[in-house]
Amino acid sequence: MKHEEETCLSIFVSLSFLLGACSDQPTETTAPKEEKANDAKETTGTKENEAKEVGTHTAQWSYDEHTGPEHWGELDPANSACVNGSEQSPINIEFSQVKTDKKLEGIHIQYQPTTFSLVNNGHTVQVNPTTESSNIVVEGNGYKLVQFHFHTQSEHQFNSQNYDMELHLVHKDANGKLTVLGVMIQERRENEKLASVWDVLPKEETEKDISVKEPVDLQALLPQDQTSFQYNGSLTTPPCTEEVKWVIFKRPIEMSKVQIQAFQEISPDNHRPVQSLKEREMIRN
């Protein structure tokens, strides 16, 4: 009898040890999996936050009160030039302050009738060439047309007066330097050269480019009298990058009231106020 009790006790102890070992094993293997899962969640969360943060920075600025021009420099450290820059654009061009005693090389504009696509980027309507056939030469350096867009009212002023709109034709050279041609727009007759662009103006922000059905002849769009003012400035939108060469034509082009209103329905006011000229020179060609 005593031998049977000892045998049962021995079996019970052995079973207990085996059950204990089995119950401990999942605990040891599960913990690392949970830690890895938590690590993965933390990593994913960080990447999602970074993506949201970057997206917010790129879409944060506007022309409205709280994220408008007065606050651009506060929205992102990359926009510091908007408040600290020494050569900011646009400017007021006082004709009496323009230097006429300096000789500048002529601007050679070599635009070809080109097909374009356009996009409403939330800040303006931007028109992009589908070829690289249009370019300019400024002071012996070649620049290719990369896009053109519009502002209302005009960003630059002549003798403290704004025009109804302003056209910016943006060009880039082989080193990434920019030259922008600025053309004032006044309300008068319909501009047939831009009719094909105005026919497809997107009223809301677009994700994909919209094709312009007919080629646009930008050479014929420019004023015949190409007297211009030149100065060194910046982008007129964040990040307000400087070292941009500006060429502002003195003579405006025309658009009808209907055409101007069609753009203003999309962008009621997308102009940056004029900035201080400081020590810069304005030169007339």
What is each of the regions a protein language model found here?
Residues 4-10, 22-285:
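Alpha-carbonic anhydrase
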Residues 15-16, 75:
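Residue-level signal for mature regions of secreted extracellular proteins and peptides
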